[in-house]
Each structure stands twice: as C-alpha cells, then as structure tokens.
Amino acid sequence: MIDKLPLQSHYEARVEDLENSSELELAIHKYLSNQSICLKNLIDTCAWHETLMSAEKTVENWKYLLTLTLLNYCISNSGKELAAKVRLFEQKPWNQDSQYFRILVALNHALTKMSVPEVGISLLESGAALIDLQEYSSWQAFPYIPHHLEFGIYLSILVYLTKRDDLKKSLIRLGKWQLNTLDANYKPLTALFVREQNGDPEENLLLYYLFFHCLTAITEENEFISALEALSKQLKNRNYSKKIHPLWILIESFFKRLPEKTTFFTLPEHIYDPSTSLVGYRSSNGCTVCTLHGGRTGLGCIKLKDVEIVNFGPQYLPLSECLGFGIEGNHLSDHGLRKSIIELKKQGFSLKGCTRLVDQPSSSPFQIGLFRGIWLEVTQELVQDRLNLKTTFLGLDGWEGTAFSFFAKAEKCRIKGVKTLLPGTLDRYEGNAQQISLESKAASLNLNIPSFEGTVQVIPLAGKHDFWGANFLIAYILHSDQKNYHWQIEFSKENFMD
C-alpha cells in the first residue's frame, strides 16, 4: 500500500461511494490499493470530445489522455495502443504555438515511449512561463494561475522522464518565480494573476501543493521544501469539498519520495519582478502586492492577518459578472508610455505606469469583446501603514458603465456612520462614499476616497468558490466627468510592518 499523501486522503474519502465513481476513478483507486487493473476498455473507449473551439475543452481532452498514459506507465503496460491514441489526438485542432499544449503533447509522447517533440520552453527573465491557451493572442500570454502551476507540474514529470538538465534548470527558475505569489507564511495570494473563472481558492491551493510536491522530488532546495511543508499543512487543515481530478491524484503518487525536513526558509521581504510589472512587500503579519500586467486580472492584493482585499481593479457593469473585470498588458506592451517604473523602499515600494481596461464583454458568447479604448495611469505606493492608489482614467469615448471594485474578505464590513454588513446576507449599501472598514478579530483595513462624485455599492458575498473567495464587494461606480481618483487603504490595530 502506498503511504497516504494529502490528496490521496481527500480523494479516497470522496470515492468511498464506488457506485458513483467513473471507470477511470475506480482504476486509480485500485492502483492506489495495489490491486491489479486492466485498462483495455478505458483505452478502447478513449476518444476526442468535441471542443466547439474551446481551448479549455481541448485542455480537458489532453488531460484525460495524460491520465491514461500516466496510469498505464505506472503499471508498466505496453504503450503501443495509447501511442496510437496520442497520434489521433494530435490530428485534432490544438494550439501548437502554446507551450502549455506542447508540453502536454510531449509528456504523452514520453509516457508512451514515442520520440519526444521539443517543447521550446519560453520563460521571462524572472523565470515566469508565458501561458497562452488561445491562438493568435501573444499579447495575452502571461503566467496565469492555475495554468502556470499545471505547466510546472507537467514540466516536473518531463524532467524526471528525460533527465534533461536544461529542462531542470527551467523548472527551478519557474519554481523560484512562483514563490513571488506566496505570502511570508507560504500561503497563496488567492487572486494574483488569477481570472475569476479560475479563482477557486480550494482548487488553486491543491495545485500549489502539487506543484511544490513535484518540484521537491526533482530538486531539494530549501525554499521549495519549506513551501511544500507549509502548503501540505494548509491542505490537510482544509475541509476539501470538491471532487479532485484523477490526474492530480496519480501525479501525487508518481512522486512518492518525500524530501528530508530542512531548516525553514524565510522568503525575501520584497517581491520584485519588472518582467511581470510585479512588486510587493511581505511580513509575518501581512502582504501587499501590486502589478500593472495581466489579462482580465486585477491590480493587486492586500493581506493583514485575518483581513484581505483579495483583488482590486476596474471592471464593466454589471457587477454580478467578472468577464469584464481587470486589466490587460504584458511584457510585449511594457514600453514607451506604458513602461512600468518600480521603486523599492524600506518596508514599502512604489509602482507607476499605464495599463488598459480589458475589452467590454459581448452579449453573445461567440462574439469578440468591444474595444472601448479605456486606459489607466496608475500609481500604487506602499508607505508605512498605508497603500495609496491613484488612477487617472483616459478614453476618447469616456468610461461610463464602469466601476472600480475591491473584493474583500473579513468578518464584517462597516460603513462609517451608516451600517454594518455581514457576509452572506441580503443586506447591502448603496449611496455616497464613506469610510469603509473591513474588520476581523486580529486586524482591520480602512478604505477611504477623499473626493468622489459617484455612488458606492457594498454587497455581501458568499465567500466560497466564486469571486476568489471574497465575501464582500465594494464597487465605486465611475462617471466620465471625473477622471482622477485616489483611494487610501490604511492598516490598523496591528502595524503591517511589525
């Protein structure tokens, strides 16, 4: 019997009801229990499912095939029949310009003893991998979570199978960059470089753990082992409620050897990466991280003990949908007037530059978004116990129908002199701008805007799988007659820098 690892423990608790488990899940359950299994029927029935031009559905096809090829490899079966399936899948449309897809294809080749095509790993100077699932969209290539983590997981297996030093060096660089997306306690920054539809905190915590689990099996560096130990504890302490993809269970068991415990590695206080316009400061009490790059992602996040602003940035109305949330820009657009200027300070930083609001979503799912040409000049400055966020909106046709939103997580939200809201309730606030306090037991964050001519909406949320796990939405409705905005976010009760 293979020793129980965190994902296996969660997984087996979910597949106890074997009658409702798929044939593939039953096969993996037998493998983990050291029972004999036959994959013939699974291989025979493995087929490409229609994608309707969806990159995400194409990914699911390849991930299902990878689950089969990896399971087949683990039980030392001949890979001839599955190799034929790999060749059939390659004849279907898939984005050959995307290194995410290329590594999926290469891994299936390696596991079925076929010649392994070159992946052509492309990393930014900092070590971040460029992920672009959609074709002809290089300006949107970015280290999005969770695909960046999945890419690192696949790369770990490929390094193990091929023993290539160049791939191992790329993997280590990628892992060191991924540490930028963790706070000082190795907790993932829930919404950093994460689109809302991929923002389930449970699922992403699982992938963070699995990535560092794979990474430490390849290279036992102190910071990676410290990350794995912390993430493993976080996962064990979480009541994981969703179904786990069989592939992740299989990959966890593939790397059975656990690293030796090591001295805890303290992450650097400052986060600094010009290639992703990323800067931040983290301490044991909290973390503030800001960026001007992304694609339908936010401008940053703030954590102070048990209070968080998990994401903030511009978005189109209605507030109920996040398809129109966020900014767009990457290393290709970071030049000239859009060049980000980063300055590190003692226990702080400043970030200045220009970024663009994403295209306004179309009402039809098969049409591209409407280009509104709305730009933001942004200055984000962390000084002592305050983040100053200054924005200037620019656009020939104005910016009506937009808002600037803060997604927060706290025990309660107090609108000064008006009311106090609790998460998950139907009560809400809509009115003039007042000081807004996000409060929990150990800390609070105060949100002020000295001069604002529009209305503010404060809406309690469920705080589970949607909206990056936030339980409050604070939205400032913008109007074209005001272009300059200045928010002040103050840290209180416990000094952020202590």
Residue spans for each PLM region:
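Extracellular polysaccharide-recognition and catalytic grooves
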Residues: 64-73, 80, 84-276, 281
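Catalytic and substrate-binding regions of extracellular carbohydrate-active enzymes
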Residues: 247-405, 410-411
